[in-house]
Amino acid sequence: MFRWYAINTYSGHENKVKANLEHRIISMNQAPRFRRVVVPTEQVIETKDGQKVQIEKRVYPGYLLVNMDLNDEIWKRVVQNVLLGQ
């Protein structure tokens, strides 16, 4: 059954961990067990030097959201290895 899971990582490394996880999923032929890997962000307008600038800000710094069909094999071979190799 597919469910959403929050995976904790170092703040600022979310995109690197996401890329590593996606690469691992493909290389281990586990794509059918994963639907989405997301770093939740939102567009925010901030004022810098008197000008409004639109930036992308992480909603949950230090977390990835993953929609997957989790089992022990997936956790040990894919997710845990990616997290250890941050």
Language model features: what each stretch is:
Residues M1-Q86:
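Acidic-enriched and Gly/Ser
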